[in-house]
Amino acid sequence: STWVLASFPIPVRSICKIMSMKAVRNNRLGSALSWSIRAKDAAFATLISDRFLREYCERGTFSDLDLIDNLGPSILLSDRLTFLGKYREFHRKYGEKKFFAAAKLLLMLMTARIAPCSFWMTLLTDALPLLEHKEVIFSADQTYELMKCLEDVMAAEPKKENLQDDDAEIMKVEMLRLALARNLARAIIKEGTLDEL
């Protein structure tokens, strides 16, 4: 298989691209991603990664978890694929109750700017349970970073001409601001207490 790929790179890649496009048309995202990785087609891998992320936003779950969990070095094919793999890793850490590691990864996804801007509000919403956790998960500095990310999201959103703003979005932003403020207060108290010891 490796010999074939090395001997005939252009025809093999073309076949892989065709198979990837066919899989997308049949709405088989896992297969499409696998073929685009074999073709080393970064642009198409990015497109498919975006489809996975849209599907996650619509359904609240990922399809083809086994593939996403085992991307290996191919995760570096495109920034969006890297984000998809790392975002899935965040969910895995959270599910395993490794909250500090999950929080650190979530913050890295936002501050490294590999997350698509359209996905930032989803990431901030994912931070809510960690911000509201009985134990302080985000430090004061990390909370300030999240606050800056929220303000960046709000500044980037176009001002709606319609007076009837999306109530759900407004509620989400207010919940985030409240959770961030509470977490900041708890983190400052905790860190101040630790400094005194």
Give the ranges of each region predicted by the language model:
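Extended alpha-helical solenoid/arm regions of large eukaryotic scaffolding proteins
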Residues: 1-197
